[in-house]
């Protein structure tokens, strides 16, 4: 049974529905963010809508903070693209005691709330980190069919040397065959909940023995729990690139014409004023085609 009960977690819900009748063939896409990612999340949604006008998508944003201005922008975005956007303001008290780092706050655990919340509501949810920009079609994800016992479709992170490192550190030998990045999760909601993944993950994150091993918080935990129950799909759906790499003399940029989602890992994000590099272009195009078009990029503080 889930430790994240709806009545305890969801404080407020705001629905901006400008597609009057939800299509039967709709892809539900969810984000879990704190206030620092509201700007990025809005533009991420705009980028998906901009590149997938022929697909019906409904968006779900789980956050612990939203201002009236933010609500207006998300409403305007839904209206602009004749779409449906839902904002859920959540109580994070049960998550704040879990491990966190400078780069990963308790907001990283919102994906557990998301996967539990949609049980008996939707069969499939695409969870995305908010520091992404879409530049291609996601129709294959809309049409994706899970195989028996498959809990999620995922994208591998890095290379076999990294997988072997994770397998050793996390005392899970099977991870040597593949370790995924949790910024993209196409989740089979029924299988996730039948396997009690969220509850098991929280238990592990409260276990000192496990906490001493993990370095990538819920990503490490999910790799252990979902081991053998995921399908690895194309890197084009989670093409990771750190804008900080641009400071190097030579950089290998994996983003290409086939890339669907650029995932801007690392501390510098495309909404930062100093992220003025070609790789930020997909984000800036979507920003210009959204209610955030006149918002300044963030300056150094």
Where are these regions (language model features)?
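Short internal beta-strands
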Residues: 57-65, 153-155
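Conserved donor-nucleotide/metal-binding helix-loop-beta segment in metal-dependent transferases, i.e.
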Residues: 132-166
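A glycosyltransferase accessory/donor-loop signature
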Residues: 1-33, 182, 187-301
């Amino acid at each position: 049974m889930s430790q994240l009960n709806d009545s305890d977690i969801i404080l407020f819900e705001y629905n901006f529905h400008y597609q009057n009748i939800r299509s039967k063939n709709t892809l539900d896409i969810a984000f879990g963010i704190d206030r620092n990612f509201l700007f990025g999340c809005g533009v991420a949604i705009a980028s998906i809508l901009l590149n997938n006008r022929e697909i019906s998508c409904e968006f779900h944003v789980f956050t612990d903070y939203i201002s009236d201005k933010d609500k207006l922008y998300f409403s305007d975005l839904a209206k602009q693209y004749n779409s449906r956007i839902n904002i859920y303001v959540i109580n994070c008290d049960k998550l704040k005691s879990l491990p966190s780092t400078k780069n990963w706050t308790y907001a990283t655990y919102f994906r557990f709330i998301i996967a539990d919340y949609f049980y008996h509501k939707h069969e499939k949810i695409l969870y995305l980190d908010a520091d992404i920009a879409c530049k291609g079609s996601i129709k294959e994800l809309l049409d994706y069919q899970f195989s028996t016992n498959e809990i999620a479709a995922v994208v591998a992170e890095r290379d076999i040397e990294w997988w072997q490192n994770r397998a050793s550190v996390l005392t899970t030998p099977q991870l040597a065959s593949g370790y995924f990045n949790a910024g993209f999760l196409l989740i089979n909601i029924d299988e996730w909940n039948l396997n009690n993944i969220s509850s098991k993950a929280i238990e592990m994150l409260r276990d000192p023995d496990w906490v001493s091993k993990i370095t990538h918080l819920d990503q490490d935990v999910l790799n252990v729990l979902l081991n053998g129950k995921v399908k690895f799909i194309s890197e084009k759906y989670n093409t990771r690139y750190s804008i900080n790499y641009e400071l190097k003399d030579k950089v290998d940029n994996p983003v290409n014409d086939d890339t669907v989602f650029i995932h801007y890992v690392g501390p510098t994000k495309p909404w930062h004023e100093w992220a003025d590099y070609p790789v930020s272009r997909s984000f800036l195009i979507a920003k210009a085609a959204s209610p955030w078009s006149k918002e300044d990029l963030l300056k150094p503080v």
